[in-house]
Amino acid sequence: MDSQKEALQRIISTLANKSDEIQNFIDTLNHTLKGVQENSSNILSELDEEFDSLYSILDDVKESMISTIKQEQVRKSQELQSQLSQCNNALENSEELLEFATRSLDIKEPEEFSKAARQIKDRVTMASAFRLSLKPKVSDNMTHLMVDFSQERQMLQTLKFLPVPKAPEIDPVECLVADNSVTVAWRMPEEDNKIDHFIMEYRKTNFDGLPRVKDERCWEVIDNIKGTEYTLSGLKFDSKYMNFRVRACNKAVAGDYSDPVTLETRALNFSLDNSSSHLNLKVEDSCVEWDPTGGKGQESKIKGKENKGSVHVTSLKKHTSGTPSPKRTSVGSRPPAVRGSRDRFTGESYTVLGDTAIENGQHYWEVKAQKDCKSYSVGVAYKTLGKFDQLGKTNTSWCVHVNSWLQNTFAAKHNNKVKALDVPVPEKIGVFCDFDGGQLSFYDAHSKQLLYSFKTKFTQPVVPGFMVWCGGLSLSTGMQVPSAVRTLQKSENGMTGSTSSLNNVTQ
């Protein structure tokens, strides 16, 4: 019966996954169909605009050429009209002179004839007919303004759609995810020397397989990539996967997207649990700050409602004036009713835990303290850590502790044992937890120098733990285990600092 139920559950799970996959594909088809309709409409509009632009250019050129022909016609006509007018005047003068000369032949008197002859000679000498060119200044030839658009017609007949680059092919084998960086590599299916650049798009997702159309996150765009490889660095891996796609572009147009590739980007993401922290801690998702006035507003509300309320408030004021040390602030200074739901830690345990438990695998996160922070601890603990317990003072917690209040100390702590660390306190501490391997190591986050390493066997899930007094801490999560740390872990066999080295060291 049980085996049949398990088999049925597997079948149900398989069917559910297949249904989800088909639904995602249906969404993709609908999205693609909508895109085809919208893009076709846009392309038709662009085509109309292009042809209208051609028509406009042709009309402009036609008008310009017509104007040139008409101007040439006017010029030649004016030249010929001017020459024609001159010829008519010369002809008229010549005919008058001819008539006068003909009449002079009939003169009988010698003196009068001689006078007429001299006049005719002078008029002939001055006659415009003898100075006039009888060659037209312009010809009627207009062939220099003829056109032959056969070549242009051939060019117009060769109009076609732009050559579109083929879709690139992303090579998952060549892609690399390491050190919170992702390198994506691709190639063209065939050589294309007209490609100018590539566009890569990516988005984060929590779904494996093909990208989902209804994914809440938008595609981010990296443009003008000249090579066939690109690296995104400095990422926060706050999702399980990332989708990538690439398209090639020539000088005019972008081609189709490559088939999308989904790369795994798992990393430990957690926030600080504000609901269970000490009341003297001001907690946000990724930072915690010590607040000596924490809970005062709530205490004032209950003042006068209890017989001993005034005593508690007076005691609290004495202890919170100035900057008290951890030893001077006690649980008795705040009535239990004030803490309400935030009584997970109290007394001198200025503790806040992460909201995500570690049950397996290797994980890494980093912590940075404020410059004026007096005291803080960073490590892990079982969920059973007591409300009065401080990190490192029980057998259920491991940490490194920094104190600069009375004297500067840097130590590893576990089970109320202390191991002084003879290394400078780094600006930022990296925490590496190998749950299955039973190892907790601390590093200088910048240089990746190993500070200390605990070797143990975790019997319960652990949660990141933090203590802070007079100062604050900021947290960086969503980080992969750095390559340098992985390399050091392979060479470091747990011999450098272990819990056994703390057994004989008193606090």
UniProtKB/Swiss-Prot annotation:
Disordered, as annotated region: 292-345
Coiled-coil parts of chain: 70-109
Domain (COS): residue spans on this chain: 105-162
Ranges for domain B30.2/SPRY: 291-484
Compositionally biased intervals (Basic and acidic residues): 298-309
Biased composition (Polar residues): 321-332
Domain Fibronectin type-III: 164-268
SUPFAM superfamilies, alphabetized: Concanavalin A-like lectins/glucanases (SSF49899), Fibronectin type III (SSF49265)
Record's protein name: FSD1-like protein
Gene name in the database record: Fsd1l
